[in-house]
Design a protein with these regions (language model features):
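C-terminal substrate-recognition/cap domain of FAD-linked oxidoreductases
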Residues: 22-39, 233-406, 410, 421-422
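A glycine- and small-aliphatic-rich helix-loop capping segment at beta-alpha/alpha-beta transitions
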Residues: 88-104, 132-136, 159-170, 209-216, ...
């Protein structure tokens, strides 16, 4: 923590209490987004660990923080869920990260006006669930719907699922409120929205928004395959020309289909939790439309498909792709890293753009794209989200990364542009945003933020990173062959432990995309509200540890231990990582093998289990005191049977009625069973989850012997 932040600590603690953190670990976890900066470039960004992280819970608190920060010249970096890779949420000037996690309320839903008013930190999925209760739904949403925030999408700018019909997100915003550096609050609507949309918090901290929504209707999904990019272009142009009532158009390229087929499926202790659906190695287009329009679509689609050399795929594939539309990052497990490259190109040049990219980039390039019928210039546009599988642990990652600049340069050649500005492409702001918008942003920024405290170095800033990106763009002729010569290795390949982290867990730590799907639904996180308590926070910390920048301490050991093992993170994970199983493996490593301290009450439980066979410190001689006397002769330990009723510690010592009710039900059902009485010991599951695996094993062996 800097000396300046040290002087401000008392103010922040008195104002925000438990909603401000100065913890080294916490601050580090709020100093990055989903992208991994190559090691050769990282020095240009310098230290991005903020001095503090603050979580305001109201617009009033946000305004007070902004006014204080301006008076004290403290930089403020707003953070929704940091699901972008453009660096917009990275605190390049340190200062304070403003985490909007607690500003997550749905303020008002207007069914008649078809609008919703929300705080900026509300997650799309949460909002959609609230809308559904009133027969409404979102007009469009990002592919990061399970984790990203409404305010973050306005600040970043974007298009997503539903954008074929609804366009860019900004055009679906009625109004937005933002806090200015002087602590005042201004409402933006109409053309004025351009002063905060895509500005990434550089001109104001978005606090509240009103967006347009639509009636909730049944949707139908169709999947079409096309052999090449020009056929895809022809198909989509025909959809537009025929005015088919389509709500959303998504598509993937053949390499994405290939890698999805190779990607590991979700498992639960060796058993697959999902069916295997094999995709054809082709472009796969997913059309989504309202059920009431199905007849019109069905009448015209076959002719359009045939003219584009396409083929309608099975309903199984269509439903599988729609169900997994948020699991784009499953291919990251094969990397375990991805080099991102996101651009926007006109539909009319899409085929040529893709053909040129395939010629210039020989690395495996996976793409998922969204078609916008009415783009920013009134013409159809395609948002192309591309990834190159790579491995950030290898030095060669530094050579693969510049290929993203090649893709951006080719996009510009065909009338396109980078998707966003952020930290890396602020030097291309005029291409991304347009000259007139950049001029207005500069004027407004100069007027309201003369001290430059709001998200410095982004969008229209001129930092070292932006300068380096522009410079590198002039040397693509040199960087391109170097990146293409790197040998691409695809597939999970854990090779051995890294420091003391098991090989598979080490691989998963890098395979985690930091998408944040696991965060809000995590029991451990929502009881505390800080990144270190989330699965993605732990994965990132493990990377830092394996690279020698962090060391284990009791706080981090405790963070691994307090997971409730509910496994909801496994179900939410966009890469289908075995998260809970990894934490269990680390518990055994940290506690059983390295003899670190577990949660103190478990030490007492372990002692009681070894001595008396139970976690409640009851005497073994009293273990069977609960058993009904009238059933002792019929089902007691002297009665031989192939079936044993295992009561366990809690039923034996604490909640006797559980055991009593169970044995009476079994007896009434004429089930023959026996009971071990004092020979029975604890199930030892508490010893398993707290990492004391030696006690778990000894107790299990004792139970097996008793049977």
């Amino acid at each position: 923590m800097t000396s300046a932040a040290g002087g401000y600590r008392s103010y922040l603690e008195s104002k925000f209490g438990q909603r401000v953190s100065f913890s080294h670990t916490e601050r580090k976890l709020y100093g990055h987004d989903i992208a991994e900066i190559p090691s050769l470039i990282r020095p240009l960004v310098r230290n991005t660990t903020p001095d503090a992280v603050v979580q305001p819970q109201s617009e009033e608190e946000l305004a007070q923080l902004a006014k204080w920060a301006m008076d004290n010249k403290v930089p403020l970096t707003p953070r929704g869920k940091a699901t972008s890779g453009y660096g917009g949420a990275i605190p390049v000037k340190k200062g304070i990260v403003v985490d909007f996690y607690r500003m997550n309320k749905v303020i008002r839903i207007d069914p008649e006006g078809r609008t919703a008013t929300v705080q900026a930190g509300v997650v799309w999925e949460k909002l959609d669930k609230e809308l559904a209760k009133q027969g409404l739904t979102l007009r469009l949403y990002p592919s990061s719907y399970p984790s990203s925030t409404v305010g973050g999408w306005l600040a970043q700018g974007g298009a997503g699922i539903g954008s074929y019909e609804a366009g860019w997100f900004c055009s679906n915003v009625v109004s937005a409120r933002a806090v200015l550096p002087d602590g005042s609050v201004k409402e933006f609507s109409g053309p004025e929205l351009d002063l905060i949309a895509e500005a990434e918090g550089t001109t104001g901290l978005i606090s509240q928004m009103t967006i347009r929504v639509q009636p909730l209707e049944k949707l139908e999904v169709v999947a079409i395959s096309c052999p090449n990019a020009h056929d895809v272009q022809r198909f989509m142009q025909s959809i537009i020309d025929e005015k088919l009532p389509i709500w959303s158009i998504l598509f993937i390229n053949p390499r994405m289909a290939e890698l999805r087929n190779k990607a590991p499926r979700q498992e639960h202790y060796g058993h697959y939790d999902e069916e295997k659906v094999t995709l054809p190695i082709s472009y796969i287009i997913i059309l989504t439309f309202r059920a009431r329009d199905s007849q019109e679509v069905a009448g015209k689609l076959p002719k359009i498909t045939e003219a584009s050399h396409g083929e309608r795929l099975s309903d199984e594939i269509a439903q599988h792709e729609w169900k997994n539309r948020f699991k784009l990052m499953v291919v990251k497990r094969l990397g375990p890293s991805l080099v991102p490259a996101e651009v926007v190109v006109p539909l009319k040049t899409f085929g040529d753009f893709m053909t040129d990219i395939e010629r210039q980039v020989s690395q495996p390039l996976v793409k998922e794209s969204v078609l916008i019928r009415d783009g920013k210039n009134g013409q159809p546009e395609v948002v192309v989200l591309g990834f190159i599988p790579s491995d950030q642990r290898r030095f060669s990652y530094n050579f693969v990364f510049p290929l993203s600049l090649i893709i951006a340069k080719v996009a510009e050649k065909y009338g396109g542009r980078p998707f966003s500005t952020g930290l890396y492409f602020s030097g291309k702001a005029k291409k991304v945003l347009g000259e007139e918008k950049v001029r207005k942003l500069r004027e407004f920024k100069t007027k309201v933020d003369p001290k430059g405290i709001l998200n410095p170095g982004k969008v229209i800033g001129n930092g070292l990173m932006s300068t380096a990106v522009n410079l590198a763009g002039s040397f693509t002729w040199l960087l391109q062959p170097m990146g293409n010569r790197v040998t691409a290795k695809i597939g999970e390949r854990p090779s051995g432990p890294v420091r003391d982290i098991p090989a598979d867990v080490a691989w998963y730590a890098y395979a985690c995309s930091q998408c944040g799907y696991c965060v809000d639904e995590c029991d451990q996180f929502y009881g505390r509200g800080w990144e270190s308590q989330s699965p993605r926070g732990k994965w990132y910390w493990l990377r830092e540890y394996m690279e020698g920048r962090e060391e284990w301490n009791q706080a981090m050991v405790g963070t691994i231990l307090v997971c409730t093992t509910c496994e909801l993170c496994n179900l939410r994970c966009s890469a289908s990582l075995p998260i809970e199983q990894s934490w269990m493996k680390l518990r055994g490593k940290l506690i059983n093998e390295e003899k670190r301290m577990t949660i103190p009450p478990f030490e007492m439980m372990a002692a009681a289990t070894l001595r008396e066979g139970d976690i409640w410190a009851g005497y073994r001689k009293d273990r069977a005191a609960w058993f009904p006397k009238d059933l002792w002769e019929k089902h007691g330990p002297s009665h031989p049977s192939k079936t044993v009723y295992f009561a366990g510690c809690t039923a034996s010592y604490v909640e006797n009625d559980i055991g009593m009710a169970t044995v009476r039900l079994l007896d009434a059902a004429n089930v023959d069973f026996t009971y071990l009485a004092e020979k029975e010991s604890c199930c030892a599951i508490p010893m398993l989850v707290c990492g004391k695996w030696d006690v778990f094993e000894a107790t299990m062996r004792r139970n097996i012997k008793a049977v």
